[in-house]
Amino acid sequence: MALAVRDRERGESALERVRAVAPRTPSSVTLLDLADLASVRALAAREREYALPLGLLVCNAGVYAGSRQRTVDGHELMVGTNHLGHFALTGLLAPRLAAAPSARVVVVSSLAAATAGTPGLGEQEDAPFRGWRAYAGSKLANLLFAAELARRAPALRGDVTVAAAHPGWARTRLLTRRGPGLGSLVTAPAAATLLVQGPDAGAAPVLRAATAPDVRPGDYYGPGGPGQLRGAAVRVELPPLARDEALAAALWHRSEQETGVDYRGRGTSPVGPAALGAEPTTSS
């Protein structure tokens, strides 16, 4: 098992906890910055050197920014990290997934996806920036990516099952850092008791999507309680926009352009950031 992390110290801390419960599992920490496509390619190259099948890939990274920020490659930070980084990593590791007797990809989204109006790949520079709107768009992009990858998985020429999951409203670093309003609500006793669940419970839908034998291609898992905020992990419905196959196909095409990663095995050159729905940029 490899933990791909941006912060080595936190990664090593997580690895110690893994080894405490699974001491015989070969495990390691490797550095990855999903906001830098060169870092994504470097990790994929290192992993290919092992020449071993990959049985499970969990696309779990997520960032939130209250102000407009950019990735190394010039994309809006949240869609660039939360979606494009995962899209590129999964595509570059696809041959290793296909080489496994049975492999699974789990894309972690958020309840925020249901509030998004677009998948948020890029934005108009002159438009007011709304951090929550951009975050929600990146999480919708996660679901559209998972759904489209599930449809395209047979073309990978392997037994690869793709599913998605969300943690409900879990008490995590990401949630408490989304501004004083949400942070105060999360730490309030009433919210902690009635609405918010702990990190372990929040991880349950992801674990079910990753390990349950009855997972079907395109499944989506989340808490089964009211509003999917908390509760036991169950199969849940995708938000309406996440079921839009034309939107998913358009996002896929633009993601290939923006990352330079072609899942059919033909590398392309990144064309740089552009808003979804705009004409692709070209060069002469």
Where are these regions (language model features)?
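Short, solvent-exposed polar/charged micro-motifs at secondary-structure junctions
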Residues: A38-R41, L229-A232, A275-G277
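Pocket-edge positions in alpha/beta enzyme catalytic cores
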Residues: L3, L32, L194, P240-R243
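Actinobacteria-biased recognition of intrinsically disordered, low-complexity terminal regions
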Residues: R264-S284
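A short C-terminal helix-loop "cap" of Rossmann-like NAD(P)-dependent dehydrogenase/epimerase domains
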Residues: E125-D126, G181-A191
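Short, flexible, mixed-charge acidic loops at enzyme active sites
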Residues: T118-Q124, R177-L182, G222-V234
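Rossmann-fold NAD(P)H-dependent dehydrogenase/reductase core
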Residues: M1-G179, E258-R266
